[in-house]
């Protein structure tokens, strides 16, 4: 059995299937971990959802910002954007089944036997691992509760940008969601900044990538994340793996096999523009 991790797919199902074939992924025996943003901007988001859902316990995915937005649209709290190309999900006969499944996915996942964990955007520099775990479980439970629709309708916004353990209610939950699904850069004080989406080489002087600010404990598991296509898979820290390489932007879809550290990439020239 092998364990694979794949970056943001964003509806690029044909490319996903080609990449899995290239790596000789076997759904009968292997595990597939996905960094979130299964949907939006690519042409076959419905096919991606059906494929991952059909893998059952052979697949583990985390929620990304585009996945959460789709859930908000499904719940009637947001309008579908034409550029997201998710209209056929909303009219599919298995819409309810797929959306119910998607809503139950975690925003932070840890492998039960391997020293590796996964989120969509990373881990806040203002959290230790115990805090991150607690915050993830808190929001996951809320999304699955009777308050889930309300949260999906009110999660949008960039404040607060600074963590405080005394935060309660919507400000607390918004910070948690933003940290797990939207974060890229931080200011000098560790607060989150959401405007800049460039590569670190093009950032303003007062910003730093979250992974350069966060002080991880020596015994923390490896961390896999996606979301930040401008990184093109480049992260200087050996225990952090960046896997979003901008498939939907016309760049690449990238797959990493944990067992032997093998990397597999597929060029995706069919897409000239894509998602966040």
Curated annotation (Swiss-Prot):
Keywords: Hydrolase. Its EC number is 3.6.1.41. Gene3D superfamilies: 3.60.21.10. Coiled coil: none annotated. Disulfide bonds: none annotated. One of its GO terms (molecular function) is bis(5'-nucleosyl)-tetraphosphatase (symmetrical) activity. Belongs to the Ap4A hydrolase family. This is Bis(5'-nucleosyl)-tetraphosphatase, symmetrical. It comes from Tolumonas auensis (strain DSM 9187 / NBRC 110442 / TA 4). The lineage of its organism: Bacteria, Pseudomonadati, Pseudomonadota, Gammaproteobacteria, Aeromonadales. The gene is apaH.
């Amino acid at each position: 059995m092998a364990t694979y991790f794949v970056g943001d797919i964003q509806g690029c199902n044909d490319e996903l299937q080609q990449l899995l074939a290239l790596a000789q992924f076997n759904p009968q025996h292997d595990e597939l971990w996905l960094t979130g943003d299964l949907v939006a901007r690519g042409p076959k988001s419905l096919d991606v959802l059906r494929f991952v859902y059909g893998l059952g316990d052979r697949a583990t995915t985390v929620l990304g910002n585009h996945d959460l937005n789709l859930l908000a649209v499904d719940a009637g709290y947001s309008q579908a954007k034409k550029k997201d190309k998710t209209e056929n999900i909303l009219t599919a006969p298995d819409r309810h089944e797929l959306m119910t499944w998607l809503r139950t996915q975690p925003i932070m996942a840890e492998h039960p036997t391997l020293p590796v964990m996964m989120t969509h955007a990373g881990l806040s520099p203002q959290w230790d691992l115990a805090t991150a775990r607690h915050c993830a479980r808190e929001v996951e439970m809320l999304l699955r509760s009777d308050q889930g629709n309300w949260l999906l309708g009110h999660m949008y916004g960039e404040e607060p940008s600074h963590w405080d353990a005394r935060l309660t209610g919507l400000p607390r939950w918004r910070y948690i969601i933003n940290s797990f699904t939207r974060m890229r850069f931080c200011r000098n004080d560790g607060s989150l900044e959401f405007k800049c989406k460039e590569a670190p080489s093009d950032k303003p002087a007062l910003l730093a990538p979250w992974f350069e600010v966060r002080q991880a404990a020596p015994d923390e598991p490896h961390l896999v994340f996606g979301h930040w296509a401008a990184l093109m898979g480049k992260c200087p820290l050996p225990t952090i793996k960046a896997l979003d390489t901008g498939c939907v932007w016309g760049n690449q879809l990238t797959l990493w096999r944990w067992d032997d550290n093998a990397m597999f990439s597929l060029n995706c020239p069919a897409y000239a523009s894509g998602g966040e």
